[in-house]
Amino acid sequence: MRTEEKLSLMQRCIKWREDNIKEKQFILILSFLVGIFTALAALILKFFIHQIQNFLTDNFNVTEANYLYLVYPVVGIFLAGWFVRNIVKDDISHGVTKILYAISRRQGRIKRHNIWSSIIASGITIGFGGSVGAEAPIVLTGSAIGSNLGSVFKMEHRTLMLLVGCGAAGAIAGIFKAPIAGLVFTLEVLMIDLTMSSLLPLLISSVTAATLSYITTGTEAMFKFHLDEAFALNRIPYVILLGIFCGLVSLYFTRAMNSVEGVFGRLDNPYKKLAFGGVMLSVLIFLFPPLYGEGYDTIELLLNGTSVVEWDTVMNNSIFYGYSNLLLLYLMLIILFKVFASSATNGGGGCGGIFAPSLYLGCIAGFVFSHFSNDFAFSAYLPEKNFALMGMAGVMSGVMHAPLTGVFLIAELTGGYDLFLPLMIVSVSSYLTIIAFEPHSIYSMRLAKKGQLLTHHKDKAVLTLMKMENVVEKDFVTVHPEMDLGELVKAIASSHRNVFPVTDKTTGELLGIVLLDDIRNIMFRQELYHRFTVSKLMTSAPAKIYTTDGMEQVMQTFDDTKAWNLPVVDEEGRYEGFVSKSKIFNSYRQVLVHFSED
């Protein structure tokens, strides 16, 4: 009875809203709420991570190697993996990829548990030293908040997709205090279309989350950065070279990440993954303690250090402590091994994103580039802290294929607006370098291979939004190879189609098709009814469409074969139905009209 009362109360609230608040106004209210809830989620996650890290590492001696680095990461990914397998019982890795999939294939619907599951799993993972970032989990959390808040009020799927974007924008703005970057990330990475009806809700969520973050944690930028030397135009060639270097580092990170995760994917037992990932991660963190956690302390150090004495503290707690002459080699090895630490964290059962690793790698890459040049006098002096800042924008732009996000995020993170021009040069150079080798970002490449990626290309976007099950027609009469012509004629009489799929009677496998035009000249000659069987009359289909094919691939198959109807089969070759051009065009028009409404 109480459930029915709650249900009717919710229905009354929805009806009151529909009668008294216009939808556009209500979307603005929802975007404001999404911004508040997402910022609170970001604050909770950051607090959770810092409490665990401080409790575990506050008593470490900086002059000695700490063997607990061999233990903490394994404990973290074990606890996170156990939580995901036994409590959540769903895959919550690759948060941004899941959001892209929800937008393109699930009409903006994200499972409710993502509101809290990513916070707990990533908090444990990173707090215990997992070498990943908290940003992708909080972006998934924010998007889940937007999606489920919209679902509660029965909003249509276009609005759900917008609220998913609002959650992502609020997450970036809240965790980084970067409202512009939050908006740009949503447009550039999540491919949310920029229209007047979408811009205002995204801005409201982003500004609301950033404001709440300012109120609770102060108005200072996330990283302190003081520009000691203004940017000189004669350094532009070196800035371009840094961008190219960052693009190559991004390519290495992307390719290596996919390769190592592929190795973990082939391990079918979660405890094998834990053992493999745990050993790899703990050994790497023991040798290179800066790989512990998000790595923001290292970024802070390189952005503010001015001498070798300060930079050397990056080797604290390691077996390399005191070897100042090995600093450059030490940092280069971190660039090399960071991707393995991040992959081992996620592959072993942990939960985290690649935002922080991208910033971390970029900062070290920029520092190494300038420090190496200064040590060997390849050029005029290149300020290490300036190039470390620019490197952050370069690697982020390359890994995410998002140059604008890289520029605005780094500027807002550090207050480094005086370096806006070189930030843009580095970001564009890095982006142009990586797209020459890798056309899709680390987030989108998995979906792009399956034809499930929504882009700003309207035609491709509409095809992506279309679903195979909505265009498959199943009112075709099937025939079997052992049937004679007389039985085939009876089947023809009961159908209004001119094509007949031939299937195996026991397995349902598609063997071929019979076209009405091919038998029209003999179908009324009764003396031939027992002479011919379907196996002699059938022909091969021009091509087969698989239920797993994307609509863009389906359209390409139609163009290649010049056919009007094509059979659809599952992965085992069993007949499912037919797809026709006319059905696709009708469905395309319906989706286009709905998709284009502003």
Placement of each model-derived feature along the sequence:
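Alpha-helical transmembrane segments and immediately membrane-proximal extracytoplasmic
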Residues: 1-475, 479-506, 510-511, 565, ...
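ATP/adenylate-binding site constellation spanning eukaryotic-like Ser/Thr protein kinases
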Residues: 205, 426, 473, 516, ...
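Short aromatic/basic micro-patch
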Residues: 462-465, 513, 544, 578
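Structural signal for short hydrophobic segments within the conserved structured cores
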Residues: 475-479, 536, 541-544
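Short hydrophobic beta-strand motif reused across regulatory alpha/beta modules
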Residues: 512-519, 577-584
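Nucleotide-binding motor/catalytic cores of P-loop/tubulin-like NTPases across gene-expression machines
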Residues: 516, 531-534, 553, 563
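Conserved Rossmann-like nucleotide-cofactor binding loop
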Residues: 574
